[in-house]
Amino acid sequence: MFKLVTLEDAIRIPPERFGEEIDNVGYEQLKIKYDGMVDEELGYVIAVTNIKVNPFGKIIPGDGATFHKVEFSLLTFYPKIQEVIEGEVVEIAEFGAFVRIGPVDALLHVSQLMDDYISYDERQGVLMGKETKRKLQTGDHVRVRITAVSLGRSGGSGKIGVTARQPFLGKIEWIRKDVEKMDATEEVTKEPSKGIGESKQ
């Protein structure tokens, strides 16, 4: 899910930047530090916003710069296990598909795609079910559930695993067709109820 997190930090303003708009300098400093960060607590940092730099700074002996406290907000994406999310397929491989969810690509392994034997057509870049003939390719929109999350360990960019092997998950087109089939089945199985005391003529 996307979140707006409010934080406090301190920034260093070097002497050559004295006289510039302090919030602009603060924004540049925070952008360098936080933009693109992947953190176990924050998740994926997308943007820095709402910056308020304290105009009264401190000087440390031996350093001509000033240090200022700053309040700011981070727009983050924090994937949670069991969360259902929609995304776009951005790459197809023999072992599965990569799905763009928020600012990151999650792995949809072939074993988690559908209840069917899946073949990979490398030339067409398609994963296809043997029995269902359902195809998945780049550009398709899917609904998936997050099953595994690993963030910011050892300076990595994090990993996310997702599944589509549950009811109402998978390619959006498949879900629509499944819902239509269910609605049609319900209409067929419905029988007109007879009122009490009614009898055949």
Model-derived features: positions:
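Single-stranded RNA-binding regions, centering on S1/OB-family and related RNA-binding modules
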Residues: M1-Q201
